[in-house]
């Protein structure tokens, strides 16, 4: 089923961004960020979207597998988990969610990049607040 959906949306979808001949995607459930059949989150049953929270809480949106329900067009069913306790717990949730080793690796890589960006942002905020105090 996902092959049929990919053939329909590969050249025209709302998340498609082309830059210097390379096709990227802004799909929140994408695990690679590239416009490929493997990378698009809305064409597969599994996907993960990460959002930062307060005090090391990461809101993890997991795409639901609801093939038995009639789907409305234009909607993506997702459940949101707020995982407290750091990156290792979110990694455990992701490892339990994905069956394919390749997709699991891409999702874990997305988590690592997200965590690194959050650490840098928090360090920059601390440096700015120290500079304002002095």
Curated annotation (Swiss-Prot):
Answer whether the UniProt record assigns the keyword Amino-acid biosynthesis to this protein.
Answer: no
- Spell out the GO cellular component terms annotated for this protein, sorted alphabetically and separated by semicolons: ribonucleoprotein complex; ribosome
Q: Which Pfam families match?
A: Ribosomal_L28e
Q: Which residues form a coiled coil?
A: none
Give this protein's Gene Ontology molecular function annotations.
structural constituent of ribosome
Q: Which InterPro entries match?
A: Ribosomal_eL28, Ribosomal_eL28/Mak16
Q: Name one GO biological process term.
A: translation
Q: Which UniProt keywords apply?
A: Ribonucleoprotein, Ribosomal protein
| Signal sequence coordinates | none
The entry assigns this protein to a family as follows:
Belongs to the eukaryotic ribosomal protein eL28 family.
- UniProt name for this protein: Large ribosomal subunit protein eL28
What is the organism field in this record?
Tetrahymena thermophila
What gene, per UniProt, encodes this protein? RPL28
């Amino acid at each position: 089923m996902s092959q049929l959906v990919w053939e329909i949306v590969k050249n025209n979808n709302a998340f498609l961004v082309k830059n210097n001949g390379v096709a990227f995607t802004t799909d929140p459930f994408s695990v690679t960020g590239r416009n490929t059949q493997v990378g698009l989150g809305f064409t597969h049953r599994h996907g993960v979207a990460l959002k930062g929270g307060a005090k090391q809480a990461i809101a993890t949106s997991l795409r639901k597998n609801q093939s038995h329900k009639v789907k409305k067009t234009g909607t993506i069913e997702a459940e949101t988990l707020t995982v407290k306790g750091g990156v290792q717990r979110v990694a455990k949730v992701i490892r339990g969610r994905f069956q394919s080793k390749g997709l699991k690796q891409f999702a874990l890589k997305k988590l690592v990049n997200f965590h690194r960006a959050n650490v840098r942002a928090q360090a920059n905020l601390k440096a700015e607040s120290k500079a304002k105090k002095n």
